[in-house]
Amino acid sequence: MSFGEIIVILVVAILVLGPDKLPEAIVQIAKILKAVKRNIDDAKSSIEKEIRINDLKEEAKKYKDEFSSTNENIRKKLSFEEFDDLKRDILDKTKVDLTFDSRDDKVKNNLSGQNLNTEEKPNLSKLETQDKNGKINV
């Protein structure tokens, strides 16, 4: 609105309302416009909050879907049966028998280095060879 339009509106308002009711009318109009503006601002902020909430929900849904698909891919790649087979294979490969029979004196003697007869000594000629310099090759 230009300044001329505002003056025309004021002149018409003075003629219709009169000079004594005009100040009250202007105050009432200002209160109404202020309330309307406040309601519009509240509506805008509510809409913006809803939009942010919807964006957050969509983002959370994306993360949930991504997590679910990754979880499903892992389940497809490694079923429980395969996991049990893998576990069994690992246990079989890493199993070491460290038990000794107390009746086996040869094992005890060989481990402790005691009472070795020439008959009980292992034949190392097949495993080790000695070169001219005295170096043992395995």
From Swiss-Prot:
Provide the transmembrane region boundaries: 2-18
Q: Where is the composition biased (Basic and acidic residues)?
A: 118-138
Gene3D superfamilies xref list = 1.20.5.3310
Mention one GO molecular function: protein transmembrane transporter activity
Which Gene Ontology BP annotations are present?
protein transport by the Tat complex
Q: Where is the signal peptide?
A: none
GO cellular component terms listed in the entry, alphabetical order: TAT protein transport complex
Task: Please name one Pfam family that this protein belongs to.
Answer: TatA_B_E
The UniProt function text for this chain reads:
Part of the twin-arginine translocation (Tat) system that transports large folded proteins containing a characteristic twin-arginine motif in their signal peptide across membranes. Together with TatC, TatB is part of a receptor directly interacting with Tat signal peptides. TatB may form an oligomeric binding site that transiently accommodates folded Tat precursor proteins before their translocation.
- HAMAP family xrefs: TatB
Q: Which family does it belong to?
A: Belongs to the TatB family.
Report what the protein is called: Sec-independent protein translocase protein TatB
Source organism (scientific name):
Campylobacter jejuni subsp. jejuni serotype O:2 (strain ATCC 700819 / NCTC 11168)
